UniProtKB/Swiss-Prot annotation:
Annotated protein name in UniProt: Isoamyl acetate-hydrolyzing esterase
Annotated GO biological process: acetate metabolic process; acetyl-CoA metabolic process
One MF annotation (Gene Ontology) recorded for this entry: hydrolase activity, acting on ester bonds
Reaction equation(s) it catalyzes: 3-methylbutyl acetate + H2O = 3-methylbutanol + acetate + H(+)
Short name of one Pfam family: Lipase_GDSL
Organism: Schizosaccharomyces pombe (strain 972 / ATCC 24843) (Fission yeast)
């Protein structure tokens, strides 16, 4: 159903909006947003932080969900899952209104230093579970690290972390059926005919790489939770055709 045909929207009584404006605007408006506007929350590292560059997957998801879900993005360049978990209590997340959570970490965890992995694989798995635990009512997509065509800072060994991401999804689905999905970005990028075109520097995605990731996210949602596709979500505020002559 096109946007112009959509009659399924979130409507608000004029009296309710009037009360919000007249009684303590800041406090009431925040309450109003939390009550009505559901969200897509994304947590990741630099690949997510750069996700608003032209063609970036965060920008594409924000466009995809215009006036259907608010998109909250928390990308932390250079962070491992350990670092994100450390600062999780300080991130102003809207947990109750998050319909879909995407966690894309592991690219920094799997770096091999002189003393071992930057974040050991068992800890990585536990961190993923801890990061998703505050979202018991959200659908969750775990994105595994992809390949790298060049070593940046350190050599990376992704395969154990892909397995850990898969095991995390299995654990989440045992707790609550069909609550989580996996995007195996390692296999997807590895099997791409010309993988070097997916990256700007061998690690961070080009617009082509981001497009590949965006399409995988949409495919995962379509298969597992079609009710979360934009056309199946209410429009936030009436369509212009409903109010043009009012």
């Amino acid at each position: 159903m096109s946007d112009s045909q959509d009659k399924n929207y979130i409507s608000f009584e004029k009296t309710e909006i009037g009360q919000i404006v007249s009684e303590a605007p800041a406090e009431k408006y925040v309450s109003f947003q939390k009550k009505y506007f559901n969200r897509l929350t994304i947590i990741g590292d630099s690949i997510t932080q750069k996700g608003f560059t032209p063609g970036g997957y965060c920008a594409e998801l924000m466009n995809f969900y215009q006036r259907r879900l608010r998109v909250d993005v928390w990308g932390f360049s250079g962070y491992t899952s350990r670092h994100v978990l450390r600062y999780l209590p300080e991130i102003p997340l809207e947990i109750d209104s998050t319909k879909l959570l995407i966690v894309f970490l592991g690219t920094n965890d799997c770096q091999l230093t002189e003393t071992g992995y930057m974040c050991p694989v068992d800890e990585f798995k536990n961190n993923l579970l801890a990061l998703t635990r505050p979202f018991p009512h959200s659908k969750i997509i775990i994105v595994s690290p992809g390949i790298c065509t060049k070593d940046i800072c350190f050599k990376r060994e992704q395969e154990p972390y892909v397995i850990a991401a898969s095991e995390t999804v299995n654990t989440l689905n045992k707790s609550k059926a069909n609550s989580a999905g996996l995007i195996n970005l390692y296999e997807i990028t590895k099997s791409y005919p010309t993988p070097e075109l997916l990256f700007t520097d061998g690690l961070h995605f080009s617009s082509l790489g981001y497009s590949l990731l965006f399409n995988e996210i949409v495919a995962t949602i379509s298969k597992a939770w079609p009710e979360l596709l934009p056309n199946n979500l209410p429009l936030q505020f009436p369509h212009w055709s409903e109010i043009l002559f009012t």
